[in-house]
Amino acid sequence: MDQKLGNKFLEPDPKQNVFYRPLHFQYVSYENFISYRLKEILSVNRTLLSFKNDTEKIVLRINNIKIIPPDYSPIIASIKGKSYDALVTFTVDIRKEVMTKDGLHVSTISSYEGNDSQLIKIPLLIGYGNKNPLDNSKFVSPNIIGGVFINKQSIEKVGINIVEKTTTWPKFKIVKPNAYTFSFSSISPVNILPTKYRHYKITMDLSQLENCYISSAKTFITVNVIVLIKFLINQDLNYIKNNLTYGMPLETIYLINAIIESSKTILEAEDFNINDYIESLIESEFQKQRSITSIDDFRYDLMYNFLPHMVNSSDQLKGFYLLGLLRKFIYCIYHTSRYPDRDSMVCHRVLTYGRYFEILANDELENYITNIKNDITNSHKNKGVCNVSIHVLTTPGFNHAFSGLLSGKFKKTDGSYRTHPHYSWMQNISIPRSVGYYPDQVKISKMFSVRKYHPSQYAFFCPSDVPERGPQVGLISQLSVLTSVSNIRTTEYIDLKNAIMKYIYTYDKNDISYFQTGHIITIENDLVAAINPELVDKFVDDFKFRKRVNYFDNLEIGISNVKDHMNEIRINIGSGRLIRPFLVVYKGELVMDTIGEELEKRIDTITFSDIQKEYPHVIEMLDLEQFVFSNVCESVSKFRELSDEDKKLYDYCDFPNEFRDGYVASTLVGINHNSGPRAILGCAQAKQAISCLSSDLRNKIDNGIHLLYPERPIVLSKATETSKIAINCFGQHVLVALMSYKGMNQEDGIVVKREFIERGGLDIVTAKKHQVEIPIENFKNRERINSTAYSKLDINGLVRLNAFLEPGDAIAKNISSRTLDDDFVADNQISFDISEKYTDMYMSRVERVQVDLTDKVKVRVLTMKERRPIMGDKFTSRTSQKGTIAYIASESELPYDKNGVTPDIIINSTSIYSRKTISMLIEMILTSAYSVKPYNNNGKNRPICFPSSNETDIEYYIEFARKCYQSAIPDLDKDELENEVYCESILYDPETDKPYKTKVFMGPLYYLRLRHLTQDKATVRCRGKKTKLIRQANEGRKRGGGIKFGEMERDCLIAHGAANTITEILKDSEEDYQDVYVCENCGDIATKKNNNVYCIRCTKLNLYTVLTKIDTTHVSKVFLTQMNARGIKINLTFNEQNPLFYKPMKQIDLSPTILKNHDLS
């Protein structure tokens, strides 16, 4: 039942407008930004400048905001394959308000009605075949024939969900022994715009406890934290001491007493007044910053904006919030490991599509307003009038910022991050679900240390889909299939917070005012109450109960009871939280089991939202923080094995293992039956598999798109099915035999049947973009030149449609002309071809030509080519059994079974044992069983569910296959049945027609073709360009590059004894040959000056030198020079050896032996 409930979550839920679960939270986030948040951001009414003691003000107001999105939602747009973008217009009014005796006089300085539909253009979620979603490209030939696809630079191509830098928990850091810091961020709520950010730091040095300060750069005073708390809460030191010591470990109480005592040096000074003391610090900070505002405004900004996330709270509540932070700080010093560290996902929120654009829109709006303010200021300073340039008004930077985002750059200050390349359909789902980190958060040093699977990532992140190499090796980033990211609109946020506070205030006032010895309650870190310790468990249980029955009209609230001496109840309702469902355990009993029979009857007819509504206590949505601070059993089977007493310790139970995998890992089969590395390698190879795109390939001008004939996998998981990966396909079923074949399939080599290839097996179509930029004067040049490269061009200078391009053919005309400075030449103008050529090794047909005319002519050509498997192409199974075609055999060369069937592919059987991929055998057994019984007892086609990770025993699958054969072929005897179940066949040798002595494992398998194609990588050249430094062939086939001759290549030739070949490759060419003179005294290379060769070292010492001329490679000289530059001296020594000569070989009589025994005479 737990598996069925997990599957229900993955399925579409139309009642909640969930049509595609993998990307649903992304669509909701994007729609919230366009439909709601953008208007909130743009609704500005702000004073820019004020004069004459605020009697004259310059006020900016943005109104008449019109957002024109499509009539349908982004979710429906994605399903129907329609484009989704939005146009935004607004009006900017700049007015001058003057307070006179007669009242307020308002005059308009400037007003701009933004009727231009391009003022803000929200990029496409899904778009047509334009390269840039912000500009309309023009198709020259031919016109668009229709068809929609996910655009190259549309929103769904934004690669990863970035982790926010700011943390929701304070960060504890050990600066040095006995010195610590506790830094935290305070961000204003979503309804406060513009957003205010404040970052504070509490420092503590155990040797100088009187300097336990809280500070913030230029936004707050530096003050003793105890003094500030006393100032805010207006209580004595005993009250503060009782709060800090209540329920704390004994070892921390000594430190608390010392901190309180050290603060008395300030508080018990003569004639001390705490209000005057704080006021003096404010004045001192005012003088230090040299603020241009008045002292009253400075004081108000400093104190009112202290802790912006509690902007509407009283000073007392802010003080108690600081007191709670100080309590955590002290506890951290002694129990660091029990506090969420900075790598914990408990501390972080995740940016989704909508949040990307929300942050960018906020930043660009502030830049826009700042530019207007600066223009008015300069105009007033220089001309004495308040005017603003129309150019400043009409050029907001939204479109430029959005375009930068789609190019992989989030902000100007942030480094670029990887946008995903759309190699396969799976990456539409997998990459936008992954969570990435800023470049400075992933240190290169982590390459050399083992990355641990952080406890906070358990169940929410996929442990299998991790990079296997590079600086991000082992970085857990893919969300599990059940995980999503929370979204909430501003109005919903305010209503939900008010509803929660209303519920909290239903408790007796005395029970929620235990600020001295109670547990504080925070909503998004905003302290709202402190509850009686005796009521904590009752409050949390009742809150969870009300949450599940949708009392607050939101099922994604997170509530965490943080015990362990920190005494806090944290309620989280904001966006960016990782959430997923869990099974509820109540008083030691799994609620699912109490209504199991009723659920079993209805499970096929209800949706996930129906379960939440009609059976609210079966499943609860937990955010990651609530999960960490709850007791969760890892599976239902483990929970049922526990004793009754142990069961009562748990709050929740997790779903089966398959739901902890990501969508890429879910395409694999039985990874828990294989060795660990196979899961990691399998995920990497699944991303490289060639799939069938769901969009019109002919209109998609993009790099390296391949199309495979669609064939749905028979053995799959529910996540693969509901995510549409199975329908879009990423492989084909082939008949595989596990055996050795004449030594051809050693190691990774595989043998493929020629007739299988000729019939279209694993055949693909490659659609490739070829793009060139040509100066417009070269493109329009009418000069004629004789070049065979232009044979495929049309009269307009572009390559013809349906032309077959060969290596060396030009894609577009590019003729450069020059004038010779020679008066004796009649025709002193020469023209020559500088066009870029088609460089692929294979011919391909021109499918589309697109031209964009700007300052240059940008030509994009889409070519199509059918590509059959050839020697060197790579393939893999879903268990990471990667292989390379080593031999293509005809059918007559291959072994056959009793029915004359020959295998399509032969794989080395030892690979199963060496790589420990037992699940590959199970997949073949199940696929073979499906082939004999593809329909269930109701006559419906039923794919076989074999999840990526499962707790099912292998014998269960064997028994399932056995029943399939017994049902389909009931007259099989026991031995024949076992042979069929285990796919064991007697094969016959094609040369002798005799059976092999051993049965061969042969059966159907879903096989994947990878993007690593021989013709894309093979490089052939005799001579060409070389790099200046090492004088080896440069890289890149487009640049006429070749393969570098390195150490391994050299060692191969040495092993073959090909000394002359090595000499020819490394030394004999003019560029590589290098004569050097070496001093036999010191081993230095001699210096050549004015045609004289001498050793610098020995000459300075007046020593006689003997220079010996040697010939070596240029690379050797470069190596010696680099070593010398690093202070490492290398001596070249000479050993005298006598010359070696090969002795004469023995003469061998090669005449036939029959002639030796007969006299020919």
UniProtKB/Swiss-Prot annotation:
Assembly with partners or alone: The DNA-dependent RNA polymerase used for intermediate and late genes expression consists of eight subunits (147) kDa, (133) kDa, (35) kDa, (30) kDa, (22) kDa, (19) kDa, (18) kDa and (7) kDa totalling more than 500 kDa in mass. The same holoenzyme, with the addition of the transcription-specificity factor RAP94, is used for early gene expression.
Annotated protein name in UniProt: DNA-directed RNA polymerase 132 kDa polypeptide
Protein EC: 2.7.7.6
Gene Ontology cellular component terms for the protein in this record: DNA-directed RNA polymerase complex; virion component
Functional summary from the UniProt entry: Part of the DNA-dependent RNA polymerase which catalyzes the transcription of viral DNA into RNA using the four ribonucleoside triphosphates as substrates. Responsible for the transcription of early, intermediate and late genes. DNA-dependent RNA polymerase associates with the early transcription factor (ETF), itself composed of D6 and A7, thereby allowing the early genes transcription. Late transcription, and probably also intermediate transcription, require newly synthesized RNA polymerase.
Reaction equations catalysed: RNA(n) + a ribonucleoside 5'-triphosphate = RNA(n+1) + diphosphate
InterPro entries linked to this entry: DNA-dir_RNA_pol_su2, DNA-dir_RNAP_su2_dom, DNA-dir_RNAP_su2_hyb_sf, RNA_pol_132_poxvirus, RNA_pol_bsu_CS, RNA_pol_Rpb2_3, RNA_pol_Rpb2_5, RNA_pol_Rpb2_7
PROSITE patterns: RNA_POL_BETA
TM regions (residue ranges): none
Family: Belongs to the RNA polymerase beta chain family.
Sorted UniProt keywords: DNA-directed RNA polymerase, Metal-binding, Nucleotidyltransferase, Transcription, Transferase, Virion
EC class of the enzyme, as a word: transferase
Biological process annotations from GO: DNA-templated transcription
Subcellular localization(s) per the UniProt record: Virion
Coiled coil stretches, renumbered: none
GO MF annotation terms: DNA binding; DNA-directed RNA polymerase activity; metal ion binding; ribonucleoside binding
Species name: Fowlpox virus (strain NVSL) (FPV)
Keyword Cytoplasm attached: no
